[in-house]
């Protein structure tokens, strides 16, 4: 449903942020 899509989108966003953070450090 729409909630699943939203959660998946949020998860991807967090994952990208974490990856950038790791690359930064």
UniProtKB/Swiss-Prot annotation:
Localization annotation: Secreted
Coiled-coil regions, chain positions: none
Keywords: Antibiotic, Antimicrobial, Cytolysis, Fungicide, Hemolysis, Secreted
GO-annotated biological processes: defense response to bacterium; defense response to fungus; killing of cells of another organism
GO cellular component: extracellular region
Primary location recorded for the protein, binned into one broad class: secreted
Tissues where this protein is expressed: Expressed by the venom gland.
Entry function: Antimicrobial peptide against both Gram-positive, -negative and yeast. Also induces histamine release by mast cells and shows moderate hemolytic activities against both human and rabbit red cells.
Miscellaneous comment: Minimum inhibitory concentrations (MIC) are the following: E.coli standard and drug-resistant strains (MIC=5.0 ug/ml), S.aureus standard strain (MIC=0.5 ug/ml), S.aureus drug-resistant strain (MIC=1.0 ug/ml), B.dysenteriae standard strain (MIC=2.5 ug/ml), B.dysenteriae drug-resistant strain (MIC=5.0 ug/ml) and C.albicans (MIC=7.5 ug/ml).
Name of the protein in its database record: Antimicrobial peptide scolopin-2
Organism: Scolopendra mutilans (Chinese red-headed centipede)
């Amino acid at each position: 449903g729409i909630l699943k899509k939203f959660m998946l989108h949020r998860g991807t966003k967090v994952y990208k942020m974490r990856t950038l953070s790791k690359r930064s450090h």
